[in-house]
Regions:
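Coil-to-beta-strand transition motifs
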Residues: 11-12, 46-50, 84-86
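Short peripheral tails and domain-boundary helices/loops at the edges of structured domains
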Residues: 95-115
């Protein structure tokens, strides 16, 4: 769920969303990037659970209450460890000179969205 410019007043300066991540599954996937700064806040069930956040070429172990700032147009995606539900709240700032209007998938992952290319 996202609260973005499609449902917010034009004066809005933030895009806000939340994600419920199933155990062992990816989210914010395929990897993507955008020029605006973003921040993630994480919670887990059970609380001692964890996941991983990819940020560029770095991978961070994410735990209950952690915050992951995303800057510099870095590619990012998230995964919950098996056995742990992960929740995160994310927010992207709308700079006046560069408002958020979506993200860009990186190659070759954008092809994953074209179902005609999947052969089973």
């Amino acid at each position: 769920m996202a609260f973005d410019r499609t449902i917010a007043p034009p004066q809005s300066k933030l895009v806000i969303g939340e994600v419920l991540n199933f155990p062992g599954k990816w989210s914010s996937y395929p990897p993507h990037h955008h020029s605006q700064p973003e921040i993630y806040y994480y919670e887990f069930s059970p609380q001692w659970g964890y996941g991983h956040g990819e940020l560029g070429e770095d991978v961070y172990k994410i735990k209950q209450g952690d915050i992951l700032p995303i800057t510099d147009n870095k590619v990012h995606s998230q995964t919950a460890a098996p056995g742990f539900h992960m929740y995160y709240l994310w927010s992207i700032r709308h700079p006046d000179e560069d408002p958020y209007d979506g993200f860009t998938y990186i190659k070759p992952f954008e092809t994953m969205l074209d179902l005609s290319l999947i052969h089973i």
